[in-house]
Amino acid sequence: MSNDPTHQFLIQKIVPIEIGGIDFSFTNASLFMAASAAVAAGFLYFSTSNRAIVPGRSQSVAEMSYEFIANMLKEGAGKQGLKFFPLVFSLFMFVLTANLLGMFPYFFTITSQIIVTFALAILVISTVLIYGFYKHGFHFLNVFVPSGVPGILLPLVVAIEIISFLSRPISLSVRLFANMLAGHITLKVFAGFVASLGALGAVGVGGAVLPLIMTVALTGLEFLVAFLQAYVFAVLTCMYLNDAIHPGGH
């Protein structure tokens, strides 16, 4: 295993594929994107395939996840937001599963790749724009015109709102990417201290106790962050979808 804390984020080809000079290689990132989707879908399928009146653990988790996102959508976008439940629920489960899989040794954390998180953010913003214009036409542009703004300040406020809207995919993607990247690098550094000090013998083993405690604590924290980042991504998605459903409502 490499001592470089950034080595874990390198994209490596598993099956090299080149078509017309374009690289379509199947990589470790491709593998774990597929694995994240498969694990999330598989868990939901098997946990609900034999539904019981008194649910077991897996069924309870699946039902709690469903209700969690449904309530989040109702609070963030109103009852009309429930039409986007498949999108938000799929994003939440995919991001959460990808984050959790990345916690295991030798596994790849796809949410530590800015291109992956940016693609997810673009999917969200594209949905907002397409639905907003489809449902409201050019009245959707009212999302850039907050109510109660004095006329003299309106041009400035509209410009700020447009810039804020355009920055959403950047902030949405960078937030997830940066948190997963920083957390895994920190965890790798402390784990490296444990291995390096342990290799020094008895004295080193004694000195490795503190880094080991920090590694265990950070591991627990990273599992919490894995959930929180999926939660934040879903919450912000609901907020953005609310603009498409109720433009000019802020």
Curated annotation (Swiss-Prot):
Q: What is this protein called?
A: ATP synthase subunit a
Q: Does the keyword Disulfide bond apply?
A: no
A GO cellular component entry from the record: plasma membrane
Is Transmembrane helix set as a keyword in this record?
Answer: yes
List the Pfam families.
ATP-synt_A
Q: Quaternary structure per UniProt?
A: F-type ATPases have 2 components, CF(1) - the catalytic core - and CF(0) - the membrane proton channel. CF(1) has five subunits: alpha(3), beta(3), gamma(1), delta(1), epsilon(1). CF(0) has three main subunits: a(1), b(2) and c(9-12). The alpha and beta chains form an alternating ring which encloses part of the gamma chain. CF(1) is attached to CF(0) by a central stalk formed by the gamma and epsilon chains, while a peripheral stalk is formed by the delta and b chains.
Where located?
A: Cell inner membrane
What would be the name of the gene that encodes this protein?
Answer: atpB
